């Protein structure tokens, strides 16, 4: 089967935003205008087509990123048909993992901001993630019909809070209740969308007289931004002082793809104005799969390989989301980077070294689906029938193996114990949790060996609430949930030298392992991928006093003991262990003996090295009305918070930034609501581990050891 749409006409984009900036409504309008959903779904009444899990419709927030394919030829039918794959991403802070996961497989992004609340903490997080993956993006300032809407103030915030090179490509005509449409600064025309047919048709009109000067000014800035794309355009601009429409678009495209500038459009998705022009901009300024850097990966021989976006290359794809579907079982969403895959083909998952056969393939549209026979480079689709694939795994051609880089998932910071309400549900709960953990790598399940309880861990209280909620709805398992537990860690404060000796020589084959270790605290560094390095092992053995083959066993023994902790059973972070001496026995020494010697030495040494308990510190930002500021700050101080600063926030509010221990943040949402009559909002993300004060450490240790 030949390709229907050439790969140059593909756009794989994500729509990302802060909670409530109107992202799902924006996506809905995109689906409406591209002719897929004939009735516009409103989030206000819980009917949006992208939000397909029940809880999303109830809470009015988007949790799972659904992938949707649609086609667009332009507002004026001015383009050949383009294929746009959209990934809707959640904006709530507990789900940043979903956003990270989607950005990894996108080529471009549309960031939706609210015209009245502007750049919010979550936007900054999304922006940082998009920078990390070098995703070219444009911004849609939505809700221009809202009270307090101010387009230029949002553009200014983008420059100050996101350090973005923001260039307006439109200006709003009117604002709040009088919002009428936008001026296209490239064409220098007022776009007036018709109210009768929900904005499907429009007319180009002259710019309102009172806006001409302002439009000229911003048109000038736009042309300058385009001219800086290359020398040819610059020279023409310097000679003639103007560029043609095609040249402006060409220049803006080059600079957007290079991440030099970020174009800003505006409108109101709810009022059916502006989204149509954003679709045009996606096609004109965001990249096709062939215009982003080809993806690299590790080949079988550990060297680096490259896969270009082409059907001729060997097949490679990345699984970026797993979803459980009541009818077909597991759906594995993949982004195809290269090659072609037909229904029934075999693929290999090099991460787990397993072969898989692709049963069926479907193209998703929100929650409806159509069966397809093949996928090609650039496609985003869901595969059915894969048995052992987790988020972030690679699927590739068995004859040309490649492992595309793994996605990095943050460590969970909060845990709760769960138990089924009836004994009969125990097994069902295990199955449900297993499925949910396969879908979401930032959610973990383990059984506490001592108490036998099932412990679930995640990125925040809302995250775990939704997991428990989904067990009840999708798997019909009701649970009792225990008190939240904090993921503490341990560390050493002093350097020590210590001996570990494991000897059993009482007849028969004995055991003999003997090591001298130096343990030192080390500051946690980041490696090239931005992952934390929390442990280093250095081998300084000379003259073979400990034979080479036993050295990895010593390292392993130390690491196993580090996982078990020495104070209260929490893993130890930030240790440099140097093996510098020891001895062995020709007959009785074994890997096992040296592993035990290493772990004994670590335990003894860590207890002598002035160990400390570390607690997770959260970066908290509270946006509050000024009159509640005193209460908010006082409350954060009571929670052992360290106030880092206060600044103006949009809409006359104040932003308070603080570092607060996670253990003090439980139930914060409820307390904040009552202090500020529900007018404040907060966001929280993990920042670092820091030493816990003695009184807290003693309390935690007493509780742990009492068990």
From Swiss-Prot:
Gene Ontology biological process: ribosome disassembly
The UniProt record lists the keyword Lipid metabolism: no
UniProt cross-references to SMART domains, sorted A to Z: EFG_C, EFG_IV
Residues annotated as binding GTP: 17-24, 88-92, 142-145
InterPro entries reported in the protein's UniProt record: EFG_II, EFG_III, EFG_III/V, EFG_IV, EFG_V, EFG_V-like, EFTu-like_2, G_TR_CS
Family: Belongs to the TRAFAC class translation factor GTPase superfamily. Classic translation factor GTPase family. EF-G/EF-2 subfamily.
Gene that encodes it: fusA
Residue ranges constituting the tr-type G domain according to the UniProt record: 8-290
Keywords, comma-separated and alphabetical: Cytoplasm, Elongation factor, GTP-binding, Nucleotide-binding, Protein biosynthesis
A cellular component term, taken from the record's GO annotations: cytoplasm
Task of the protein: Catalyzes the GTP-dependent ribosomal translocation step during translation elongation. During this step, the ribosome changes from the pre-translocational (PRE) to the post-translocational (POST) state as the newly formed A-site-bound peptidyl-tRNA and P-site-bound deacylated tRNA move to the P and E sites, respectively. Catalyzes the coordinated movement of the two tRNA molecules, the mRNA and conformational changes in the ribosome.
GO terms, molecular function: GTP binding; GTPase activity; guanosine tetraphosphate binding; translation elongation factor activity
Protein's cellular compartments: Cytoplasm
One Pfam family from the record: EFG_III
Name under which the protein is recorded: Elongation factor G
Chief place of localization: cytoplasm
SUPFAM superfamilies found in the cross-reference section: EF-G C-terminal domain-like (SSF54980), P-loop containing nucleoside triphosphate hydrolases (SSF52540), Ribosomal protein S5 domain 2-like (SSF54211), Translation proteins (SSF50447)
HAMAP family: EF_G_EF_2_B
